[in-house]
Every structure is written in structure tokens, then in C-alpha cells.
Amino acid sequence: MDIEKITASLKNASSKLALQTASQKNEALLSVSSSIEKNRKIILEANALDVKNARERGMSESLVERLSLDDKKIDSIIDSFKLIISQTDPVGEEIAGWKTPAGMTIRQVRVPLGVVAIIYESRPNVTADAFALAYKSGNSILLRGSSSAINSNLALEKAIKQGLKNAKNGIDEAISLAPCKNHEEVEQILTAVGKVDVALPRGGAKLINMVVQTAKIPVIQTGAGICHLYVDESADLEMALNIAWNAKTQRPGACNAIETIVVNEKILNQFIPRLVEKFAGKVELRLDEK
């Protein structure tokens, strides 16, 4: 991987993107979402190949679920673009301001970071979501996904670039997908001081720890999951049951799916039987002695 060439192109793109108006960026994102829709069949075919290869290599079904795309997930990607387009442009927003005793006015203003690297695992939807968030906030993005999702990610990158080229002011150099041949590429990204401005790991604890320990560039560390739901004695129990069900079953393989439910002991006898009944045959419950 020619990290010098890739990052130079991304740096140039980020300089242009930082100067774009909200309407220019939104127009480009709308064009990209249309391109993903037009390329839906190609993206799903590429993903089917990744899933086939993963199963042949013996990947567990829980990991295959994370890797898989379907029409519903493509719809979700397109919906996320619409949501991001509808949001206020963060660039130039004044967060705080004050005047010093000496009469100097100081303002705290949001500005783009520059080149953002995302190191992530086998979820191809991250390719599209991360790009959209980066582009809206005026940043170019260097993506390094899992080798298991390479065909899906390449198809998504191609659709994104097509959408940017079709937009009047789109900057198609604002996205680059790093190859997935070996782990040396990840190290090249994480040690590209002055070329990559920040890295974000998106995955499990092992990946996050590797990024934090290897990086010589700034890292925004994310959570690794192990999500808890607490049900207090004052809770609406029907609402709590529905929240628990949704948080566990909507996407069980997602890192924000709950693993643990903590219940106030004063409502154990009221809540736990209803929880067992709702989850029966669908979710395995492992309860403590209480």
C-alpha cells in the first residue's frame, strides 16, 4: 500500500471539503445515496460472495450475520444518509465564546479534523455510514475494513465514488478503501504521523486495544460493548420489557445489543417472570441465584 500517495490525495480532498457549504455537501450525499440504491443488486451480489467465502472458511453464524447485507440493511443505509443530510452542518458552529479582561474575544468553533481513518471489522454497512458522517463534517476518510468483507466494501466504495462524481460539487477523492492483504497496512495507517489526523477503531476489545497500542497518531477510543440495561423499581415494566426485547433482538450481533439486565430487587418477582415469558424460546437467559 502506497500510504504516501493515498494520504496525500486524502489531505488534498479534505482541504477542499473543509471549504464546502452545507448545501454542497448535502447534494453530494444525496447523490451517493441514489448511487447506492442504483447499485443495490451489485452490492448484494458482492456481499453474497463474501458470505459464501466466510461460511466455507467456517465463520460462526453470529459473525456471518454481522457480515451479511440484505435489502432491509441497504434501506437502513439509505435512511441513515437521509438523516445525516437533515442534520445541521457542524462545521463553523460556535460552541462557546467569551471576552478576556484584556478585551480579547475568544471563540470555540467546530472545524473538520482532516483525514480520518476508520479501522473496523466485518460490518460492510460501516463503510457507508462512516463515509457519510465524515463527509458531512468536512473530513476525508481512509477505511480499513475486514478481509472477510472486501467484496462488499469495494462495491460500496465504487457506488460512493460514482455518486460523488455525479454530484456537481462532489469530491470523489474524499474516500479511500485500504487493501486488506496484511496487518502491516493497519500499522502503516496508525503510524502515519502528519498524514492521518485521527483514527477510530470500530469493533471488539481486541481490535480497539491493538489500535490504541500501535497508534502514533491520535485515537478516539470507542466502547467494546458489554451493554447493560437497568430496570428500576419505579420503571414502567411493560416499557422495560419492550426495551429489553428490542435492545437484544433487533440486531443481536451488534456491539450495542444488551448482554446484561440488572433488575432492582424490589421488583424481581414482578419483572423476571414476565421477562422469562417474553424471551421464551428466543433468547437464552442466564440468571443468578436471586
Please annotate each region the language model reported:
Residues I95-A102, C180-N182, N242-A244:
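Short gly/ser/thr-rich secondary-structure transition/capping motifs
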Residues G114, D197, E259:
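Conserved acidic residues
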Residues S147-T222, C227-L241:
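Phosphate/pyrophosphate-binding betaalpha-module
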Residues D2, S122-S140, A159, N166, ...:
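ALDH superfamily catalytic-core signature
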Residues S86, P90-G163, A215-V219, I226:
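Conserved small-residue-rich beta-alpha loop and adjacent elements
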Residues M1-T105:
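N-terminal Rossmann-like NAD(P)+-binding subdomain of aldehyde/semialdehyde dehydrogenases
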